[in-house]
Amino acid sequence: RLESVKILPSEGTDNSPELYGAITADASSMAEIANPQAKRVFCMAVTADKYVTKDGAPSSWSAELDSIIAGVIDGIKKLYVVSAGNVQFDELKNTQYPSANINHTIEDPGQSWNAITVGAYSNRIQLDDKVFKGWNPIADVGELCPFSSTSIAWDNKWPIKPEILMDGGNAITDGTNIDICDDVSILTTNRDVIGRPFTTTNA
């Protein structure tokens, strides 16, 4: 059974960073109150790229997430899977791979000790689109996805993140320029379920 709790506000507004932890706790509680007997895995693919702790130190959000997972308030331990956060396309163009991935550290709250943080590797290298004739994938099979953040730059006293990797697609280059295309991207669902139920993405 799939459950969903919205934690992002309406378009054009933002939650206060000081409330990220409380909002996450409320979202967890809403799901558990609605169906207390269910055994669930929480998946949170939302990060705060504006509030990255470059050294891996805890934030109020990651600390609250650790508390939620440990069951400090309700005595119920939880399994949380969170995203590591994405290297932006402009970073790849300006800094290049893999330096951009080293410089872009895991985004808040991915530094949570108790959460399983998910990064990405690349598994797609076949390029058939004739528009990109002469281009090549940036990452080889099994290598770090060009869009995945890392914890390489963190202080040694903080955990090594991410714990697991999943296929996050790839990017392509002609030796000078960088781009993306469907051939090396991940198929996913689209919000336009009638007109275009599927789309592609990179993570």
Question: What residues fall within each predicted segment?
Answer:
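Substrate-binding/access-modulating region of protease and related hydrolase catalytic domains
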Residues: 8-114, 122-125, 198-203
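Nucleic acid-processing catalytic cores of prokaryotic defense/repair systems
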Residues: 2-3, 79
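Extracellular S/T/G-rich loop segment that most often corresponds to the catalytic His/Ser-adjacent loop
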Residues: 104-203
